[in-house]
A protein has these predicted regions:
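Positively charged n-region of N-terminal signal peptides that target proteins for export
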Residues: 1-4
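C-terminal motif of bacterial Sec signal peptides marking the signal peptidase cleavage site
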Residues: 13-16
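Amphipathic, heptad-repeat alpha-helical segments
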Residues: 19-53
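Inward-facing hydrophobic residues that define packing positions of alpha-helical scaffold repeats
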Residues: 59, 66, 71, 78-79, ...
Length: 92
């Protein structure tokens, strides 16, 4: 009797975990692109700017959110980081 109750409950829980796919691809794509752009900015000598530091902290937060499957927040943070990377490369 317990098996008839536990099995559907377990299936429901596993389905809920697998359903967190919204923003997953954009999070991964934006995060990879932003890290690459950050490396380029560092190579060009912009690592000391305030915008570079803001971008680095945003990317660290985005990576943490990706690990905890908070993909929407990850995507937003990585987009903001890319903005600050562009600002850094512009010297602002």
């Amino acid at each position: 009797m317990k098996a008839w109750i536990c099995l559907p409950l377990l299936a429901l829980v596993l389905t809920g975990c697998a359903g967190k796919t919204a923003y997953r691809d954009s999070c991964a794509t934006n995060l990879d692109t932003a890290w690459h752009e950050l490396d380029l900015a560092k190579a060009e000598g912009f690592a000391g700017t305030v915008s570079y530091s803001k971008a680095l902290s945003l990317l660290t937060g985005a990576k943490t959110q990706q690990q905890f499957e908070a993909f929407e927040g990850c995507s937003e943070k990585s987009e903001k980081a890319r903005f600050y990377i562009r600002e850094s490369r512009a010297g602002r």
